[in-house]
Amino acid sequence: MENQARVVGVLPMSISAVTPLAGTIFQDSRIPLRIWFPAIWWFTSQKNGASAQTLQRVLGMSGHEPAWLMLHKLRVAMVRPSRNRLAGQVEVDEAYLGGEGNKQLVGVAVEIKDNGRGRMRMQTLTGRTSAEVKNFVQQHVEPGRTIVTDGLTSYGCLADDGYAHKPMRKSYGEGNHDPDADNLLPRVHRAIALVKRWLLGTSQGRLDHKYLDAYLNEFIFRFNRRTSRARGLLFHRLLENAIAVDPAPLQKIQRTHKI
């Protein structure tokens, strides 16, 4: 009875704020679920990325902005809050991605798997400093794993944090680039080539760096599920994530708040 009284006591104050969509990416959306569901189904069926203009046409929407916001909310949902970090041996490097004259440094990590099905992670960086690469690796790779890199000296700090660091080449400073990195780290550079081509096709070279992390999340979701042949499973996974993640207002979608 005490528990029942406590529950009843809070209902009059909170019932107006409680809806089945509260705490999900659908919170405060003016678009009904009967539009969201076909949008998610269409979104997960696109292999080469999705544009707001195409979604607007497919759904018969009157404006571009609602379609644009829907896609970005779905990109937020493509990152599961409790997703597992990479394991085993992991290749790590950096690359500049984005539109012409508006490129951003990005950390890239790919698992080394004999079957070629290693997962990947990407995230924008502010530089090639030890602090930046350390933070990137700690967020995305399990402790104690082997990190395979080129000779960038910034990665030397990883050994102090329980990682086995395996540089594939002699050391060089933060301001330089290893010309043989493509051969030394084939998996990560294959992924970099793929995401560059994908971004060009998705954004037509007009990508605003504020939204780069959001687009990278979409690419990672698709890349890590590239062997899946069941469209329904992708739809189900994204819908699960959409319910599990926090609401995604515009300020969260922009890179001022990392996704």
Residue ranges and their predicted role:
Residues 1-259:
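Residue-level recognition of single "structural anchor" positions
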